[in-house]
Amino acid sequence: MLAVLGACAVIAGGTVAGLAATGSAGPAGTGGAPARAISGTSDPSAAARLNATSPAPASSQRSRSPRSSSAPSPRAAPAGKAGHRDPFGPAAASYLSGRAGTVLAAVYDLRTGRSWHLGQGPPQAEASIVKLDVLETLLAERADGDGTGLSASDRTLAGQMIEDSDNDAATSLWYAVGGAARIRSFNARAGLTHTAPSSCVICPGFAWPGWGLTTTTPGDQIALLRQLVTPSSVLPRAAREYALSLMQDVTPAQRWGVSGGVPARVTVALKNGWLPLHGTDSDWQINSVGWISGGGRNYLMAVLSTGNPSEQYGIDTIDELAATVWQRMG
């Protein structure tokens, strides 16, 4: 565990890495305010909370999208003009050169099958985007023919974990699916090759749930997202649509990140993560992954950022980068 945490420390110490954006053919989420701070053992204070706080009373009572409704099919998105230019471009490189921290990102165009990567560096801590991995593992484990196979309890916990980023729900499901070993097995089937599930949930010297120290790369997060938006050998259609419906119903306060600059009419399914590394409020891991479809665009985007001096700073960085990508993907 100390090795994993140590790796996070090394990552967080860096400045913006050399920016490299490359295109390759073939296979490989409107910004908002930061999450609320809630009291409780798994709901850290505003000064240092993992990106998965338990919902505030108002949020816990908000209406949710009906679970029987299907998320729109990614393949049904407007075709538009297939983009051929680098979605990051000089503007992204110029912007990030003046920002603190290390940013890694990837974009996958579902219209063309082309992908681009930005930044260089080792895998970074997932924080609460690992909850998407937990959800997909759960769906793969429970799949029953063409259905999700989820129990009422599974659905309640999954909704809390994705829509409200609830830590307790995530911990319950982490154990329910079999922990790191089963998640690692699912990841191998899903094509993730650079993701290492955390070996502990209660980690020595770390105040928050240890699953947030799972490390990953933007490329692996694109592979995980593709399991939801393209025909998958590991997830039936009902499971994919269910996961996307949760990601589209994320509480408004957490709809920042890859949704930055995206018009309200566009479909955005996302999961974000925020984690104060080393128990301080000056070294934040801020991540965002998701699917954006509409306005002539249909793409996946994953952003990892570490070494942020504050939570909001990291959110602002990803919002701005996402807005650039949205414009250039048109």
Question: Model features per residue range: what roles?
Answer:
Residues E136-D144, A223-T230, A323, Q327:
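Short glycine/serine- and small hydrophobic-enriched flexible loop segments
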